[in-house]
């Protein structure tokens, strides 16, 4: 099968490493690459023959991080259909929007089901099928009757690079999520890029900490590992737990993990309050999906003895765009998201002209991993694909070593009386305060300056900080116009389902408070 498709890459891995561990559910069972491939092939056949799935159909999936999700996700793609993973915590109204916007033809869930998703599917007259795998030697049970169709094998299905494979919605800074269709080629290209930059091989092993309905956990954690012949462990609870994370990492001989900064901070807090007697020797730790403050990077390296590689990614790029290299390939720079990986990247001004090093502009990309455009959104496509490049909406610059530095989202830069303030810079200062665990800066409307800067912080466990403490600290470390006018002390920051802190949502949350 074509290695320009994800399905082809995984078939090649199953032939090359049939007996190596591919997927484990912690404390329950293990699947080899050959066994996983067999389960995927059988499930793909059932989707075609018994569920009536045709090439190009969209199939929605809503599961915790389970083996059934992995099998059914890959079976949908193998059946030449498009997988649309959805957050199991959505309301019925949200499910209705996403199922409708994606034109889903089928809803897949665990045997326990998902009442809001099923309610929405029923309203839209979308069929519902459950999937269950009791143990490693069992057949996958689908809640759809066996047909007498002669199509009993997926071997007749030929996957093509331009087949639709994945449909996701952006969580971006705009209020209306945009639908992002991605192809087999997009997925295969991204998996190859991730494998290459981190030198993933069949000897690697990781534990999934991020939800698999999000592109970060799905591509960087799961698919790149499977595509390298490596091993993936899913937590027994189907989601991240700070309590079981290190025991799982040790039990399954993990060599690396990838997470968002908020998860890294939770892991650090756990290390401070309940340290392990020893930690596994990791090749690297990866951080992506939001800016990692240099102070957090250094704390992670000090605590766990592994290089922390910050990367830069977007749904529209099928995740990875740039990354800091492994130590043997060059320095990793705190505060930088590294060098482009497997694609062209340029800094453009508003006229579409490429900028020289150290000059700021919009980060733009093009390559085989990049979506061809948003679904049914000509306005977003016109703005997003100018001058022959995809426009990320991020402001950044290359240094003279070719490393990318991000300043912030175009829409998140705070314009205080004409002074442009990067909230990322303020975040970094907040996180150097010894008593601050998490912190985020954001812009708010202001009659005098147009916009003013505010921030919210979570104190470290067992400490107390005041608004005056934070302001005084910021005055020592920032120019006067960058010091937050108001500081919210809190024990919780609103996050997206993937653990990202979005400034727009944080600003709304705290502005609603008196």
Curated annotation (Swiss-Prot):
Keywords: Acetylation, ATP-binding, Cytoplasm, Ligase, Magnesium, Nucleotide-binding, Plant defense
Pfam families: AMP-binding, AMP-binding_C
A GO biological process held by the record: seed coat development
Domain of life from the UniProt record: Eukaryota
Residues given in the record as oxalate binding sites: 289, 314, 319, 500
Principal cellular location given in the protein's record: cytoplasm
Impact upon substituting residue 500 to A: Abolished activity
Modified positions (N-acetylmethionine) in chain numbering: 1
Chain spans, region SBD2: 311-374
EC number(s) stated in the UniProt entry for this protein: 6.2.1.8
Top-rank EC class of the record's enzyme: ligase
pH dependence comment: Optimum pH is 8.0.
Binding site for ATP: 170-174, 214, 289-291, 310-311, 315, 394, 409, 500
Family: Belongs to the ATP-dependent AMP-binding enzyme family.
Identification of the protein by name: Oxalate--CoA ligase
Source species: Arabidopsis thaliana
Phylogenetic placement of the source organism: Eukaryota, Viridiplantae, Streptophyta, Embryophyta, Tracheophyta
């Amino acid at each position: 099968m074509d290695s320009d498709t994800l399905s082809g890459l995984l078939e090649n891995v199953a032939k090359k490493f049939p007996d190596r561990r591919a997927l484990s559910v912690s404390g329950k069972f293990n699947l080899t690459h050959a066994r996983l491939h067999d389960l995927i092939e059988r499930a793909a056949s059932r989707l075609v023959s018994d569920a009536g799935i045709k090439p190009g159909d969209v199939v929605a999936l809503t599961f915790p991080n389970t083996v059934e999700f992995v099998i059914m996700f890959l079976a949908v793609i193998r059946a030449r259909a498009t997988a649309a993973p959805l957050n199991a915590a959505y309301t019925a109204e949200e499910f209705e929007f996403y199922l409708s916007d994606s034109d889903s033809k089928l809803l897949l869930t665990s045997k326990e089901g998902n009442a809001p998703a099923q309610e929405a599917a029923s309203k839209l007259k979308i069929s519902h099928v459950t999937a269950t795998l009791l143990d490693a030697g069992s057949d996958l049970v689908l809640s759809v009757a066996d047909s007498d169709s002669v199509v009993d094998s997926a071997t007749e299905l030929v996957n093509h690079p331009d087949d639709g494979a994945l449909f996701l919605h952006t969580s971006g800074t705009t209020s209306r999520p945009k639908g992002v269709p991605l192809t087999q080629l997009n997925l295969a290209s991204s998996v190859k890029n991730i494998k290459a930059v981190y030198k993933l091989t069949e000897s690697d092993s990781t534990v999934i900490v991020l939800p698999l309905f999000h592109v970060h956990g799905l591509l960087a954690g799961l698919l790149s590992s499977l595509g390298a012949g490596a091993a993936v462990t899913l937590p027994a609870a189907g989601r991240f737990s700070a309590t079981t994370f290190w025991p799982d990492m040790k039990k399954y001989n993990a060599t690396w993990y990838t997470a968002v900064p908020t998860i890294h901070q939770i892991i650090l807090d756990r290390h401070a309050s309940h340290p392990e007697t020893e930690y596994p020797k990791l090749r690297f730790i990866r951080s992506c999906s939001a800016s990692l403050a240099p102070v957090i990077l250094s704390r992670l390296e000090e605590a766990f003895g592994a290089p922390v590689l910050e990367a830069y990614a977007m749904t529209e790029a099928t995740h990875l765009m740039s990354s800091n290299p492994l130590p043997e390939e060059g320095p990793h720079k705190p505060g930088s998201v590294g060098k482009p990986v497997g694609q062209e990247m340029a800094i453009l001004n508003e006229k579409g002209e490429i900028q020289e090093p150290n000059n700021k502009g919009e980060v733009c990309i093009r390559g085989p991993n990049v979506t061809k455009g948003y679904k049914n959104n000509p306005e977003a496509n016109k703005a997003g694909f100018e001058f022959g490049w995809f426009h990320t909406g991020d402001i950044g610059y290359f240094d003279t070593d070719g490393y990318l530095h991000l300043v912030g989202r175009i829409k998140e830069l705070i314009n205080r009386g004409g002074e442009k303030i990067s909230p990322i810079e303020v975040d970094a200062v907040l996180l150097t305060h010894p008593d601050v665990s998490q912190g985020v800066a954001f812009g708010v409307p202001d009659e005098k300056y147009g916009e003013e800067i505010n921030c919210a912080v979570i104190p470290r466990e067992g400490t107390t900080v005041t608004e005056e403490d934070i302001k005084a600290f910021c005055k020592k470390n920032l120019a006067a116009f960058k010091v937050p006018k108001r500081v919210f002390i809190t024990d919780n920051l609103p996050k997206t389902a993937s653990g990202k802190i979005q400034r727009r949502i944080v600003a709304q949350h705290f502005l609603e408070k008196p």
